[in-house]
Amino acid sequence: MVSSPDTTLEFTDDPARFLAETARHLAVEPVLSTVIASVTARMVRQSEGAGSAGDQPHRWWAIARDAAGVVAGVAMRTAPFAPYPAYVLPMPEDAALALARALHGRGEALGGVNGALPSARVVAEETARLSGGVASVHEHLRLFELGELVLPAAPPGRLRPATRDDAELCLAWFRDFAHAAAQQAGRTEPHAMEEFAMDEMLARIDDRIVWLWEDEAGEVVHLTGATLPANGVTRIGPVYTPRDRRGRGYASRAVAEISQQYAAHGVRCCLFTDQANPVSNHVYEAIGYRPVVDMVNLTITTPGPA
């Protein structure tokens, strides 16, 4: 535990305990907290010890409390991909500084910070200062929430849930998604993301949170995924169409139909876009998604040995 006159910072490696202690805080702005809420809920559902240490070298959650003991901010580090970034939601500046200093003090190298501004930037810049490194923005993100849905015209074919027979294709397209998104945004290197394994893909298919669009010939031409709802919010993504099938309306219609299904059951829908990708921003705004907040992915580079 780290404390100051105004803030107490507590770490835990127990996702169930974290959710129990922060449930009210996360529910205040459930769209903003979608990543931490959904990822942590998924880990609670998983069997104890699921995943290997190599897949997840860091696994913690942090709770910042004010002087009255009320939760004032949260963060986590559970990413199974290099540079294993922390994810930070809004918190007081002294809490963000305390988080960076606590990690540095225990010798935990931090290669990236994702999440809400300005807190994520404060953590990244303080980490860089302490380590003699440099914090830089890799990706500017925008979080959108569905307002009034505008259902676009349907291209030929139909949307259907993926089945286990589709698992190999779904896995390949999940893995291709980051590279395709980076290309559309004009970047040469994608931001690191989870390297999905087959068991994770099968679990998503069994949970019916992966959909495919089949064209009129029965060929699969598009994939859209989502998260299981957490605090009444689902996050749509990834949204992937192979290069030779783009521009035909598959993504717009698939996301709209999936959003319509969730909204009919009272679930709020949100998604992230890369601000540098004009294609995706236009597509989602056209079907009724509206900006909520800008977020950021930062990397921290430190000098190597002389």
For each predicted feature, which ranges?
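Short amphipathic alpha-helix that is part of the acyltransferase structural core
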Residues: 1-36, 149-190
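Conserved beta-hairpin
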Residues: 41-79, 202, 206-224
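Acyl-donor-binding surface of acyltransferase catalytic domains
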Residues: 67-71, 77-156, 298
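A conserved beta-turn-beta hairpin within the catalytic core of GNAT-like acetyltransferases
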Residues: 81-86, 228-236
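Conserved acetyl-CoA-binding loop-helix of GNAT-fold acetyltransferases
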Residues: 93-102, 237-243, 247-263, 281-286
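Conserved beta-strand-loop-alpha-helix junction that forms the acyl-donor binding cleft
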Residues: 114-120, 243, 271-285, 298-304
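Conserved active-site alpha-helix within GNAT-family acetyltransferase domains
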Residues: 118-136, 252, 276-293
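Recognition helices and adjacent regulatory flanks at domain boundaries
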Residues: 213-215, 226-227, 248-261, 272-274, ...
